[in-house]
Amino acid sequence: MKTELTKKIEYLTFKDTNQLGVSGCREVKIGTHKTKSFLTGEQEFVDYMTITSDGEIDCYEIKSSMNDLKSSARLSFLGHRNFLVLPSDLYEQVATERWFLEKLENHSIGIIVLEENNKLRLLKKCKKKKLSIGTQTLLLESFARSAARDANKLYELENTNDK
């Protein structure tokens, strides 16, 4: 179950990326049971993913607590650019931790923090990764499936409200 803080960060990430030429989707399930081993061998979910009209794919992993950050849930950094989004106080707790710094370096991850004024701020830029055509295709298909899932939920909600 998502905490209120996680929901807030997710919504603010959506608001910050909701621009002309950028499409976003939350909880993107990567691949299917047949393709999960293509990238990592594990079932992957990206908390929030955007795709630009130029085909650039950005992945955002949202963590709202130390337990969340250290949980067994995978951090899926599969896009051209990848960001870890977390509250500023959590970032301050882990900013000098060796395990955290190694994770940032190994994946060239950017850091976005939620400040006390309820604004997101880019603290650390990420390096752009080159993705193979196969990886890009898998991510685009996953994005489309997840967006269709969300559209289906809206259709169901509309029909429920019309009755």
Each predicted region: which residue ranges?
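Anionic group-transfer/hydrolysis microenvironments
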Residues: 29, 49, 63
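Active-site beta-strand-loop-beta-strand hairpin of nuclease catalytic cores
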Residues: 41-59, 68, 74-77
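Residue-level detector of short, conserved catalytic/binding motifs and their immediate flanks
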Residues: 46, 80, 109
